[in-house]
Amino acid sequence: MNIVYRFRIYPNKSQKELFARTFGCVRFVYNRMLAEKKEYYEKTGKVLKVTPAKYKAEFPWLKEVDSLALCNAQLHLQTAYKNFFRDSSVGFPKFKSKKNPVRSYTTNCVNGNITLQNAKLKLPKAGWIRIKQHRSIDDRYILKGATVSQEADDKYYVSLLYAAEEPEHEIRPVKTAIGLDFSMSELYVDSNGAHTDYPHFFRKSQEKLAREQRRLSHCEKGSSRYMKQKKKIARLHAHIARQRKDYLHKESRKITNFYDLVCIESLNMKEMSQDSRFGKSVHDNGWGMFTDFLSYKLERAGKKLVRIDKWYPSSKICSCCGKLKKELKLEDRMYSCTCGNQMNRDENAAINICREGLRILGVELDAERKIS
């Protein structure tokens, strides 16, 4: 089992310069290999095998950076090709842009070249770097590699990859369960009738973003003022992303602590985000990220996440009598049934999702536990 820990690092001036060179060299090698592979395939119909070592003689400055970072660029390109041939919808490998505000490189731990001790991190070529280690790491874990990244706000982070023995999770009996229905206006509505008071981080910052975008439009493209303003906008987006991620981590932890079984719908978030009616809401809510957090947190706790088929008519089934309502428009926010049941559409769907999840597992519950 692999576990990743992400920490903030504080490189000095020379280390920042080294990171900048490494980011550039990794991008150069990746793009060079991709270009040669494409050209060779178009001419011969065969796949070209190429390694970063080929370029070091022609471009001696590649020797100034961590060689393992260049090797990982090759591996990342191979992965991109494999992903494309496995599922063409992911798209053909693309060239890496110099203008991307987020930059990174990956290196491997070989013969102790990466070390973490006394609030400092040792990296190949860079030496010792100050690190903000906000959580402890089990001594039994084995350090395998590190990914150094520079975010849009110019802050540096390191993601440390550790190998750990797969723990024997004690599978807990299902005593408490909950169903979650994705909501456009909120993050979700649960089967207990609770609505999340979701802080729409992106929408709250839209006015400020629009103001900064207008200022950018008045700058001459490519000028120092233009680049400075562009970086300011990127920093604002990075801040919004961190706010959203922090909230989703806390919300998924709360649910994991209270419930043994969580039932959700399998939604195609990519398709939903492309819909002009609610694309912004899908991106702002971060439902896909939220379910990913839920999945691994529940698994580590020995609990279960059940995904209901996206074609299951959770919104159209009456949670009281079980009757299927054939006509239900998206704008109908209240569910009304001939049996007399009248309730919020999303609450009704969440109850049905929970029941369907219990049915799939073959579990019956006497009572449900609410989040306090």
Q: For each predicted feature, which ranges?
A:
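Nucleic-acid substrate recognition interfaces
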Residues: 1-372
